[in-house]
Amino acid sequence: MFPQIWGVIFLFTPTVFSELFKDPELLAGFYQGDIKAHPIRTRNGIVNQIYHWPNRTVPYMIEDDAFADSHYREILRAISIIEENSCVIFKPATEMDFPMALVITSKGLGCNTVHLGYRNKTQVVNLEIYPLGEGCFRIGSIIHELLHVLGFEHQHVSQNRDQYVSIQWKNINPQYNINFVNNDNSTAWHDFDEGYDYESVMHYVPRAFSRNGQPTIVPLREGAENMGQRFYMSEKDIRKLNKMYRCPDHV
């Protein structure tokens, strides 16, 4: 029997959520699955501009021999999607840019990011090799990690999440409870007046960190058909990014 919530049947097929209970964004054992350094408690997007990339520009380097040509091109496609929908620019890093640059590698387990936002030090994104369209090489998973780099946290821990989702603590593996603690009254981060977004590419899948195969995140309102999708930036993702980086022609 498929879980049915608000008249929506969630069909967790391999083409939608490959390896549902082995999602590579959750595998590495870091904070919230894919953030190595425990961040400031957040709402969803960072407000303080010291954590925004200077001049809206991210110098990046894709490690030599880390990826096949097809995977390299998919990373560039994800970068292009962000650039086309905002004023943020990713530019190949030079020696002058280091150590304040982004390094994209495939040496570790899963898909993960060292820090949220700009931290005046080298930022690293790991994308474990999977076939294109699966695991870390779902286009939305690459975008997800790049949005962490730009300053986004996961949607399900936003300050107002309890109005939109019910966290099923009984179904969560207890060692991962910290990954579901929300941001309470943090003022360091903001939703940029866009509100909660079930469709965000930053939202967990409904059964993230489940101990028993049952949902850990249950939507309380309609419109959650695509919760946890990894295919595209949602309209709210795009608007939040543009507001965060004060993009004059995109807000």
UniProtKB/Swiss-Prot annotation:
Chain ranges passing through the membrane: none
Residues annotated as binding Zn(2+): 144, 148, 154
Organs and tissues of expression: Produced in the male accessory glands and secreted into seminal fluid. In mated females, confined to the reproductive tract and also detected in eggs laid by mated females (at protein level).
Result after altering residue 43 to A: No processing of Acp26Aa in mated females and incomplete processing of Semp1
Entries under CDD domains matching the protein: ZnMc_astacin_like
Primary location recorded for the protein, binned into one broad class: secreted
Subcellular location: Secreted
Disulfide bridge partners, by residue number: 87-247, 111-136
SUPFAM superfamilies linked: Metalloproteases ('zincins'), catalytic domain (SSF55486)
Sites where a glycan is attached: 55, 120, 185
GO cellular component: extracellular space
Active-site positions on this chain: 145
Name the UniProt record assigns to this protein: Seminal metalloprotease 1
Organism: Drosophila melanogaster
